[in-house]
């Protein structure tokens, strides 16, 4: 279990509850709940900042959600964040309908089978996670040759950087893949799995 309590809706202030509900969206249930946000709810201002960052990078922008989910797995795997990788595995398999064998290849860092556009984004995201100072003109030229422009590059950087931060929070707070069931015991559980960010 995490180093902090996950804030439950019935114990949250109105402001915190509103932020968490905005993330969950209209569907309700536990499918869109984020253990990361529930942990950060112990500090409402930080929760609000992280919510805004996640909302703008994951749900906003012009790059498609499939690519952002791919980037989230690449970064989380590079950072060895088991919880984040597991969460986004569900997103890729269920929301994006990525075949399991393709996910496993991405998880293993085998990007050659990906289309050029995804391969370039995956390699860029991995470098952001592991060696951001190593991003040079050659790395950018590879990205641009795959059809990205400067706005796309900055958005990819934003998504990758957001997940570097999320991985750090998740690991430092010791949020584990098995925490979900215990954290939401007694909550509405009509759906299983996580769906939006590093839970």
Predicted segment positions?
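Secretory/endomembrane lumenal or extracellular ectodomains immediately following the signal peptide
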Residues: 1-67, 100, 178-199
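Preference for long, well-ordered alpha-helical segments
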Residues: 150-190
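Acidic interhelical loop/turn segments
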Residues: 134-154
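A contiguous pocket-lining binding segment that forms or flanks enzyme active sites
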Residues: 105-126, 146
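Alpha-helical scaffolds flanking conserved acidic
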Residues: 64-72, 152-153
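Amphipathic, charged-and-aliphatic alpha-helical interface segments
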Residues: 71-75, 116-135, 159-160
């Amino acid at each position: 279990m995490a180093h902090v309590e996950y804030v439950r809706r019935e114990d949250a202030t109105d402001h915190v509850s509103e932020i968490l509900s905005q993330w969950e969206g209209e569907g309700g249930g536990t499918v869109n709940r984020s253990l990361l946000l529930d942990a950060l709810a112990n500090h409402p201002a930080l929760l609000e900042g992280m919510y805004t960052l996640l909302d703008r990078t994951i749900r906003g922008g012009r790059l498609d959600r499939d690519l952002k989910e791919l980037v989230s797995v690449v970064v989380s795997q590079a950072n060895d964040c088991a919880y984040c990788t597991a969460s986004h595995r569900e997103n890729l398999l269920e929301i994006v309908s990525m075949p399991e064998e393709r996910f496993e290849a991405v998880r293993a860092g085998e990007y050659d089978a990906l289309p050029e556009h995804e391969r370039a984004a995956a390699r860029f995201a991995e470098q952001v996670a592991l060696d951001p100072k190593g991003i040079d003109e050659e790395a950018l030229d590879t990205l641009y040759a795959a059809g990205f422009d400067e706005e796309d590059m900055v958005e990819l950087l934003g998504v990758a950087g957001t997940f570097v931060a999320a991985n750090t929070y998740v690991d430092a707070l010791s949020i584990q893949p098995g925490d979900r069931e215990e954290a939401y015991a007694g909550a509405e559980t009509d759906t299983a799995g996580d769906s939006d960010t590093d839970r």
